[in-house]
Regions:
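N-terminal phosphate/diphosphate-binding loop that engages ATP/GTP or pyrophosphate donors
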Residues: 25-94
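The conserved Walker
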Residues: 11
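Walker A (P-loop) ATP-phosphate-binding motif of ABC ATPase nucleotide-binding domains
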Residues: 4
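Inter-motif core of Ras-like GTPase G domains
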Residues: 124-128, 143-159
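Conserved lysine of the Walker
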Residues: 15
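Cytosolic-facing regulatory segments adjacent to core modules
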Residues: 82-89, 99-138
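Hydrophobic positions on the alpha1 helix immediately C-terminal to the Walker A/P-loop
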Residues: 18, 22
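Hydrophobic anchor at the beta1->P-loop junction of P-loop NTPases
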Residues: 7
Length: 159
């Protein structure tokens, strides 16, 4: 079972710092667990805080602007392609820790098939990790627009 933690608050409130603190705590307490950092903040600062320059996002997959690290395998369905592209944009941070960036994802009100396909691919990705930490915008609607999933704990950072 995946544990999901969302850290939210207004810009500049320390969300990224707190997200990284929780990462360290989880790494110390559960070194064998796999952890996914999910940067769902429009500023996308979480990757930068590790010295990473992450340019590929879920938004890029949605809009066809994803820059591939590898060649696209042939004969895939659209769903298989989206799942493959999600794997392609995962960036390793350290042992057992990966990061993925969503950036802007659109609205759940959109009836386009890509919305459901991305939701399904994200759910499948989340299930592969023991712990997922979401670094979110001030409004959790951005997380809800990306994926329909239950969050175990939400931390609201205020200054």
């Amino acid at each position: 079972m995946t544990i999901k933690l969302a850290v939210t608050g207004k810009s500049g409130s320390g969300k990224t710092t707190i997200t990284k603190a929780f990462l360290r705590i989880f790494q110390e307490l559960f070194p064998e667990k796999s952890i996914l950092l999910f940067d769902n903040d429009l500023a996308s600062e979480l990757g930068h805080s590790f010295g990473l320059d992450i340019r590929n996002t879920i938004y890029g997959i949605r809009n066809g602007k994803h820059e591939y690290k590898t060649g696209i395998p042939e004969n895939m369905t659209k769903q298989e392609y989206i799942e493959w592209a999600m794997e392609d944009i995962l960036v390793p941070v350290c042992d057992n820790v990966d990061i993925i960036v969503s950036w802007f994802v659109g609205s759940k009100d959109c009836r386009c098939p890509i919305t459901n396909q991305i939701n399904d691919a994200v759910l499948k990705l989340l299930d592969r990790y023991d712990i997922v930490i979401f670094d979110c915008e001030f409004d959790l609607k951005y997380l809800n627009q990306l994926v329909d999933t239950d969050i175990d704990t939400t931390i609201i950072v205020a200054n």
